[in-house]
Amino acid sequence: MKQILDFIPLIIFFALYKMYDIYVATGALIAATAIQIVVTYALYKKVEKMQLITFLMVAIFGGMTIFLHDDNFIKWKVTIVYAVFAIGLTVSHVMGKSAIKGMLGKEITLPESVWANINWAWVGFFTFCAGLNIYVAYQLPLDVWVNFKVFGLLAATLVFTVLTGGYIYKHLPKEQNGQSSDVPTDE
């Protein structure tokens, strides 16, 4: 349910962009993201930091897009959000606390080196996506950028999440990955 709730603002943005324009879509994105935060809190009594950061960026850059009637701001929002996530993961690692471990470490037991590898992989992913967004936003037409933002980045994130899950599974203790500790493995 929560994952579906996370995609609703993006779907609304895409639909209204196709029906109207970037400015109507951006206004709807701001409103839908605000409603998403309220609904998330009502259902789960908690809102994650990533959601709050995303909302703040949507409100600031979306507001500037509408107020100044300049779609460059909403294009930059994507890059800045990914950059903030990459910087946040880097800073948390340097300070000795893996943000990803903080999110998943209660359910999953992994060696510190594996958490560090996952952290750096996501830093690389977010950095790559931030740069790719700038390229697509300024080298290709607005329609292409909207499709890239909605479908390309979503697909890339889902694929990277699955790859991360595979990496995690590979490094789980035998008890957590469904294998009995007395069953021989091919290691």
Curated annotation (Swiss-Prot):
Q: Which residues cross the membrane?
A: 25-45, 50-70, 76-96, 118-138, 148-168
* Entry's localization field: Cell inner membrane
Q: Does the keyword Phosphoprotein apply?
A: no
What Pfam families does the entry give? Answer: IspA
As recorded in UniProt, coiled-coil segments are none
- What GO cellular component entries does it have? plasma membrane
- Keyword tags: Cell inner membrane, Cell membrane, Membrane, Transmembrane, Transmembrane helix
User: Where is this protein chiefly located?
Assistant: membrane
Q: How does it sit in the membrane?
A: Multi-pass membrane protein
Does Transmembrane helix appear among the keywords?
yes
InterPro entries cross-referenced by the UniProt entry: YciB (IPR006008)
Q: Which family does it belong to?
A: Belongs to the YciB family.
Physiological role? Plays a role in cell envelope biogenesis, maintenance of cell envelope integrity and membrane homeostasis.
Q: What is this protein called?
A: Inner membrane-spanning protein YciB
Q: Which gene encodes it?
A: yciB
